[in-house]
Structure formats: structure tokens, C-alpha cells
Curated annotation (Swiss-Prot):
InterPro entries (UniProt xref): RecX_HTH_1st, RecX_HTH_2nd, RecX_HTH_3rd, Regulatory_RecX, WH-like_DNA-bd_sf
Localization per record: Cytoplasm
Function noted in UniProt: Modulates RecA activity.
Organism lineage: Bacteria, Bacillati, Bacillota, Bacilli, Lactobacillales
Protein name: Regulatory protein RecX
HAMAP family on file: RecX (MF_01114)
Gene3D superfamilies registered for this protein in UniProt: Winged helix-like DNA-binding domain superfamily/Winged helix DNA-binding domain
Family (UniProt): Belongs to the RecX family.
Superkingdom as given in the UniProt entry: Bacteria
Organism: Streptococcus agalactiae serotype V (strain ATCC BAA-611 / 2603 V/R)
Keywords: Cytoplasm
Pfam families: RecX_HTH1, RecX_HTH2, RecX_HTH3
One GO BP annotation of this record: regulation of DNA repair
Cellular component aspect of the GO annotation: cytoplasm
Length: 258
């Protein structure tokens, strides 16, 4: 077989043979086999060219995908599959990219954690789940997470949350809100307990009274038309306790309000 034409088509080249067979190849393929118009090739060499072209094209696709941002091994595999790369050669492409350090899940985890420490608000449990979803092995994630102390980040977030809610919630509800928010963000109980203690939150009696009367008035307006005096009182007590107010404080406020 003779090569009758090699023509550039965007990122690939078209290779035409005198047996009317055409195939797409990469520039690396041309260089590797020193292909040129008029060259005679046999069936075995043609097969080698096809295999190399697929590998080269797959690698170039992977590099293109990685060029936008760091990717995990699983993400690159999925991208290659979506672009119809032969599943039999994907492992070879991945091994090649890993050997040249284009894919490195350990580095990905380190960067992910560091970015979260700098600008994020997630604790180790949420981080682990996010990384597992990206196909990274649990042992790699855990190894990197164990090297990080998340208390400073938890402390910074707790201070922001405290400023947000300190004038909106009674003491118990405020502490519960901080506990729930930090736990939901993936911080472990011991760290959450420590950073909340370190805030040294104290009860502001004047603020608590102001908040409880506002809430009491709100509940009264909502419930007074539906219930008699006794039922109304019980429902208001239950509603305020659910919002974190202490029973004795509620009773005291009710005595003055009703």
C-alpha cells in the first residue's frame, strides 16, 4: 500500500492510501513513523500506525481535558469514554499520563484540601465524600486528611456564624445552630465542641428578653384566634421551647404578656 495523501484537518491529519482506505492520525504518529506521501507500508505497519494513532489521539484528548484544570484519574477515563476512545487502550493512555505526572490523584487531593483551607468551609467528612465521588481511593484521601488540623478552619467558620446569629437567637438555640452548621459542613464532634467552647458565649439577659417577647408576640398573633386561653398558653410554650428558649424564661414572659 502507498500513502497518497497526508492532509491537516484541524488538530488531526487525514492519511489516504491507494487502496482507498482513509484514517485520521495525529502529528505524533507522523513523526513517530516518519510518514510521508509516496511511502510504501505493509498491513502490519498499517495496523501499528492505527494503534499508535489511537493511543496518541487519546493521550492528546486527555492532555486537552487536563489543560483547563487538574483532573482525577476517574474524570479523565470518563472523558475518554465519552469521546469514543477504545476501552481496551484507555488503561494504557492513563498509565502514560500518570507516568508523566499529568494525572496524580494524591496531588489532586492535596490541592483540593488546601483550596478548601484557604477559601472553603468544609470539614474532613464532607471533603472525603466529595473526593470519593471523583473516584479517588479512600486510603489516599484519608492519608492526606490525617495530616491536616481542621480546628483553625472550624474556629474561623464558627466566628462567622456567631456574628451572623448572635442577635437573632437565644443562647441555647445559638449553640445548637453552631453545632448543627459545623457538623453539617463535615467537622467532627470533638472539634466542633472545642471551637464553640472557645467562643465563650455568655447569656445576654436583655437580648434574650427582647427576643423572647418578639417571638411570643409573633406566636400569640398566629395562635390566639384558634385556641382558648389554656390551649393557647401550652402551644406558645411548646413553640418557644422548640426555638431554644428556656422554660422558666417563657413562663416569666407569659406572666407579663397574658
Amino acid at each position: 500500500m502507498k500513502i497518497t495523501k497526508i492532509e491537516k484537518k484541524k488538530r488531526l491529519y487525514t492519511l489516504e492510501l491507494d487502496n482507498t482506505e482513509n484514517l485520521y492520525i495525529t502529528e505524533d504518529t507522523i513523526v513517530h513513523f516518519m510518514l510521508s506521501k509516496g511511502m510504501i507500508i505493509n498491513a502490519e505497519k498499517l495496523e501499528n500506525i492505527k494503534k499508535f494513532a489511537q493511543l496518541s489521539y487519546g493521550k492528546n484528548l486527555g492532555l486537552y481535558y487536563i489543560s483547563f484544570k487538574q483532573r482525577t484519574e476517574k474524570e479523565v477515563i470518563k472523558y475518554l469514554q465519552q469521546h469514543d476512545i477504545d476501552s481496551k487502550i484507555i488503561p494504557q493512555i492513563i498509565d502514560n499520563l500518570k507516568s508523566e505526572n499529568w494525572i496524580n490523584d494524591k496531588n489532586y487531593v492535596q490541592s483540593f484540601i488546601q483550596q478548601n483551607l484557604n477559601t472553603g468551609d468544609k470539614g474532613p467528612y464532607v471533603i472525603k465524600q466529595k473526593l470519593l465521588q471523583k473516584g479517588i481511593k479512600s486510603k489516599i484521601i484519608e492519608s492526606e486528611l490525617q495530616a491536616i488540623n481542621f480546628q483553625d478552619l472550624a474556629s474561623k467558620i464558627s466566628q462567622k456564624l456567631y456574628k451572623k446569629y448572635q442577635n437573632k437567637l437565644p443562647l441555647k438555640a445559638l449553640k445548637d445552630k453552631l453545632m448543627q452548621s459545623l457538623t453539617t459542613k463535615g467537622f467532627d464532634y470533638q472539634i466542633v465542641h472545642t471551637v464553640i467552647q472557645n467562643l465563650e458565649i455568655e447569656k445576654d439577659q436583655e437580648l434574650e428578653e427582647d427576643l423572647i417577647y418578639k417571638e411570643l408576640d409573633k406566636q400569640y398573633q398566629k395562635l390566639s384566634k384558634k385556641h382558648d386561653q389554656y390551649e393557647l398558653k401550652q402551644r406558645i410554650i411548646n413553640a418557644l421551647m422548640r426555638k431554644g428558649y428556656q422554660y422558666e424564661d417563657i413562663k416569666s414572659a407569659l406572666r407579663e404578656y397574658l
